[in-house]
Amino acid sequence: MKSSLLLFAAILPLKGFAETADSTIAQHHTLEEVVVRGFKQDNLSKAPLSVSVAGSTFLQRNELNGLRDMSSVFPNLFIADYGARQNTPIYIRGIGSKTNAPSVGLYVDGMPYFERSVVDMDIAGISGIEVLRGPQGTLYGRNSTGGLINIYTYSPLDYQNTMAKISYGSRNDLRLGVNHYQKISSRVGINVAANYHHNDGFFRNLYTGAKADNLQSANAKVGLAWQATPLWTMRLSALFDHSTQGGYPYGHYHAVDNTADAVNYNRPGNYRRNLFTAGMNWLYKGNAVHFNSQTSVQLSKDKQQIDQDFTPRDLFFTITGLKQTLVSQEFTLRSAKDNSRYHWMVGAFGFYQRLNNTIETQFFTPNYATPKFYHTPTWGGAFYHQSAYDLTKTLRVAVGLRYDYERVAQDYEANKYTLTTGWSSLVRTATFNDHTHFSQITPKFTISQQLSTDKMVYASVARGYKAGGYNVTSTTTTLPAYDPEYNWNYEIGTKLGFLQGRLQTEMSLFYIDWKHQQVTTTVPGLGNIINNAGHSDSKGFELSATYRPLMGLELQANYGYTYARFLRYEKSATVHFTGNMLPMVPRQT
């Protein structure tokens, strides 16, 4: 385990933090009192769903710098930490995805992160994190069948400060960071940030003598906030992130005694990624309605080289590359009057994503290579609505409905050439061109009873949906595509406050019926193939307690339990996984 020593940290306040938490509201599953900043669900402490919230002070004190660090503090959230940043599977309540599009949504300041290779990075200036468990497809749609992670950063209109940080730890783990937030007028603020991270790595390659999993990353961010009128606010932000890593620190596994050999392969691997994300947000807060517009653009380019045989022998070597272009736009309109018995929200979302994949495997003994090219454009749109009605002063029912449409195409080309002669000997061996579309209606039903100002119970039923797509490693047209997957989430829960708000507890129980699950199968020498496994389920619960016996003293405990298994999965006529536990799903968190 890496230990770290903070050498220097300076916080130079220009003005105080303009936002303060409402201490009269019990923050359930809350790691500190923070202001809820989300537009779609602005009072999570009273929302009928299982949610965890962490604020900036907690994140800083616990040195939580990136997404992978969050597994240690949120119940029933697991983010695998293996290999390069290209692979960052996220699981909530056992629902997740290892290789294709994520099953847990990620939004940073309202901007979606749809591609799994871009979600793992160090994020500067985080003001709060929300983890919503269970399908959130009604309001968020794509890639949120397991849940959702919302990350918010400071606005220079609300927060003015300069922060500089240097930290050093074992494995030469060095972090440098500077963040500056400033108002340049009463209505305009700017922020700039720069961060750097270096780590020597943990595993040494016996063949090369060098560390196999070293890391260097750097990012820079600029932002602008403008309060155009008392009712209109605009935010602009742009982020550039660069990462360079070593290859996978893998060794041969021995199932008999459950041991693994040391890292020992002859061709050093590496992973490089450049990421650019920009967004513009317009927010209107009127007396009758609130309106939100979110525009975002994301460009990423990465390249990975890996000694795929993981041995000292020259068998085969794989080079992969991915270019992504993502453009999205969302409009949301909601009612603003809290004293009304009827609350509503409507919205529209559209996106275009283009993925260009390159996969080349070099076979040294046969002396040939097989470069393959995949062009996968996807576009989609959605309309959603949610209505909540107070049957009495304490009893509320809510219904949400979303329609999603998605069209995906793939243009595939396979080639082969001789390694000794190079690309001059290139010949085309296969082509494939196809397109398909998916559509779905995802509902959500909720009923909640407010027993008192700090006590409530609720029950909900929600449907999760994840569109299908095309494989990017299939060598033939027999298995190019995979179908959509679906789940139903059934949940009951309580949020209870005691001792005049000093003790806050939350409990939620869930059962997820997961059909046509998209499962990844590794084919030696080929890669990962996605197919629909059959039928799975996941069940469990979350418990949370926060106690504040004295001013400035807070005691917290969070616990999550998940039991997820295959109810039916016949991989082939002779291989059956029915009854097996789902991979990458810890029983207890």
Where are the model-predicted features located?
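Short acidic/polar hinge/loop motifs at secondary-structure boundaries
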Residues: 109-135
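N-terminal periplasmic accessory domains that precede
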Residues: 67-70, 89-94, 107, 128-131, ...
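Extracytoplasmic beta-strand/coil segments of soluble accessory domains associated
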Residues: 68-109
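Transmembrane beta-barrel wall of Gram-negative outer-membrane proteins
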Residues: 161-163, 168-199, 207-245, 274-276, ...
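Gram-negative outer-membrane beta-barrel transporters
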Residues: 397, 511-513, 531-589
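Structural signature of Gram-negative outer-membrane beta-barrels, strongest in the C-terminal barrel
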Residues: 225-229, 239, 333-335, 343, ...
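Flexible loop and strand-edge segments within Gram-negative outer membrane beta-barrel domains
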Residues: 233-275, 302-304, 313-322, 352-377
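Short, acidic, small-residue-rich periplasmic hinge/interaction motif at the N-terminus
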Residues: 19-60
